[in-house]
Curated annotation (Swiss-Prot):
Major location (coarse): secreted
UniProt GO MF annotations: toxin activity
Family as reported in the entry's similarity comment: Belongs to the MCD family. Mastoparan subfamily.
Species this protein is from: Eumenes pomiformis
Propeptide, residue positions: 23-48
Modification Leucine amide, positions: 62
Gene Ontology biological process terms, A to Z: defense response to bacterium; defense response to fungus; innate immune response; killing of cells of another organism
UniProt repeat feature AXPX, residue ranges: 22-25, 26-29, 32-35, 38-41, 44-47
Any one Gene Ontology cellular component term annotated for this protein: other organism cell membrane
Keywords per UniProt: Amidation, Antibiotic, Antimicrobial, Cytolysis, Fungicide, Immunity, Innate immunity, Membrane, Repeat, Secreted, Signal, Target cell membrane, Target membrane, Toxin
Protein name: Venom peptide 2b
Record carries keyword RNA-binding: no
Length: 63
């Protein structure tokens, strides 16, 4: 079992090394025609992230 653990550890180390040295994408610039429906910032839409409502619901559930 120790041999298997060592092999798995070696594979993880090698994959991590390869991932760290990977080249970036060939075209890292954003596309010229982005999706108008995509919302990259969840805080820009108040309906998407309601922290106060979440806190109130947790407090009301506990109390």
């Amino acid at each position: 079992m120790r041999g298997t653990s060592f092999i798995l550890f070696a594979v993880v180390v090698i994959l991590g090394f390869l991932h760290g040295n990977a080249e970036p994408l060939a075209n890292p610039e954003p596309s010229a025609n982005p999706d108008p429906l995509a919302n990259p910032d969840p805080l820009a839409n108040p309906e998407a992230f309601d922290l106060l409502g979440l806190v109130k619901s947790v407090v009301s559930a506990l109390g």
